[in-house]
């Protein structure tokens, strides 16, 4: 099973590439790698990024989005990796701007996916907050690839356009007994400031 860290975004609102922003003196992407390695669930952790950022990562497994899918968002990153490793049974996807993802959350979601995989033939299992899916913290089956291809080819780059067409199910974030910042994504510098304050006050 492989993990995909999505790190190819423009980070315009944040003002700099979020992958290299730091929390507790550690870049976001390195903290996520440490968490994923700590689960002992993945045979490979792949960073999906763009050509501009690729050389800046201190990591050996990097896949660059294809030229025709440049600037097409998370879907392009997911597609780049799944099509490269299509024989893999399952992929865990996490956005690099979710730096406080926890081992507990990844393990719990995997259990949820496996429990529903055979009976419900799930293609995507992710988290939801107040009923709203969070498709950038989710497990994806390679069966999603044709739907991802279709979405990219039709210029509909939304993850929703994929998860609405396949069998998906979502685990409520409240079932993870951790401070709620574990699933929060960082869009602005003030989000990072707030997160650091929350960690200090924990």
Swiss-Prot record:
It comes from the Bacteria. Its main location: cytoplasm. GO terms for biological process: Mo-molybdopterin cofactor biosynthetic process. It catalyses: Mo-molybdopterin + GTP + H(+) = Mo-molybdopterin guanine dinucleotide + diphosphate. GO terms for molecular function: GTP binding; metal ion binding; molybdenum cofactor guanylyltransferase activity. GTP binds at residues 6-8, 18, 65, 97. One of its GO terms (cellular component) is cytoplasm. Keywords: Cytoplasm, GTP-binding, Magnesium, Metal-binding, Molybdenum cofactor biosynthesis, Nucleotide-binding, Transferase. Its EC number is 2.7.7.77. It is an enzyme of class 2 (transferase). Its cofactor is Mg(2+). Mg(2+) binds at residue 97. SUPFAM superfamilies: Nucleotide-diphospho-sugar transferases. The keyword Methyltransferase does not apply. It is found in: Cytoplasm. Transfers a GMP moiety from GTP to Mo-molybdopterin (Mo-MPT) cofactor (Moco or molybdenum cofactor) to form Mo-molybdopterin guanine dinucleotide (Mo-MGD) cofactor. NCBIfam families: PRK00317.1-3 (NF001457). Belongs to the MobA family. This is Probable molybdenum cofactor guanylyltransferase. The lineage of its organism: Bacteria, Bacillati, Bacillota, Bacilli, Bacillales.
């Amino acid at each position: 099973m492989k993990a995909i860290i999505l790190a190819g975004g423009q980070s315009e609102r944040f003002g700099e590439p979020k992958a290299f922003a730091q929390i507790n003196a550690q870049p976001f992407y390195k903290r996520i790698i440490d968490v994923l390695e700590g689960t002992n669930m993945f045979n490979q952790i792949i960073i999906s990024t763009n050509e501009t950022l690729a050389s800046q990562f201190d990591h050996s497994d990097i896949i660059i989005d294809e030229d025709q899918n440049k600037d097409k968002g998370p879907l392009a990153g997911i597609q780049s990796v799944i099509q490269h490793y299509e024989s893999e049974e399952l992929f865990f996807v996490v956005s690099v701007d979710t730096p406080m993802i926890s081992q507990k959350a990844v393990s719990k979601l995997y259990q949820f996916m496996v429990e529903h995989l055979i009976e419900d033939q799930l293609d995507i299992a992710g988290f939801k907050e107040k009923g709203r899916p969070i498709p950038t913290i989710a497990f994806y089956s390679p069966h999603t690839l044709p739907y991802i291809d279709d979405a990219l080819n039709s210029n509909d780059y939304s993850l929703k356009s994929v998860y609405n067409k396949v069998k998906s199910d979502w685990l409520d974030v409240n079932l993870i007994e951790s401070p709620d910042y574990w699933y929060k994504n960082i869009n602005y510098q003030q989000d990072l400031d707030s997160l650091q304050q929350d960690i200090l006050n924990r």
